[in-house]
Amino acid sequence: EYLKVLGMGCGLFNQDVLGTAMGFWLSSPTSEDVRPIGQRIPDENQTLWLFTTDATPSTHRMTVGTRVSGLERGQYRFVYQDSGLVNRRWDEVVSGDVYCVALQRQTSFHTFDEVSRAALLVEVGPDGMAMTVEAIAGGKCDGQDFSFSGAEQIFYR
């Protein structure tokens, strides 16, 4: 909200919503890194950022490095749904279910693929401090029984 006070329209930068998928995720638990916060500079290839922007209020976005097998490094988006386990807002993806998101890849600064490039399975851990994901290249979010195949990866707050 502080950006609105400044008259900037891009929205809040810190979008970590505890207990949900929304926010910035790292490849290792932050409690293992005891250096002062100013010295902790994560490798962007090892991160996952799930967020929204004021510019496109009906979509949520994801920026990913090279760590998620099956996804090219870059930014993705999806039009969110208000119910079910498919394409839910990041801040509504909570512990207890495996969700599926159909991702459209960014192709230039202002454009994205018209159809989804991959499906992303997402499960938030019980305490909200870990999240399991698996990308399925060319996959779709068909059906309602989503389960991991063994190629999943864990990210941490």
Predicted features along the sequence, with ranges:
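Short, hydrophobic/aromatic-rich segments at coil-to-beta transitions
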Residues: 19-24, 58-61, 94-101
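N-terminal glycine/threonine-rich, aromatic-flanked beta-hairpin/loop signature
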Residues: 33-86
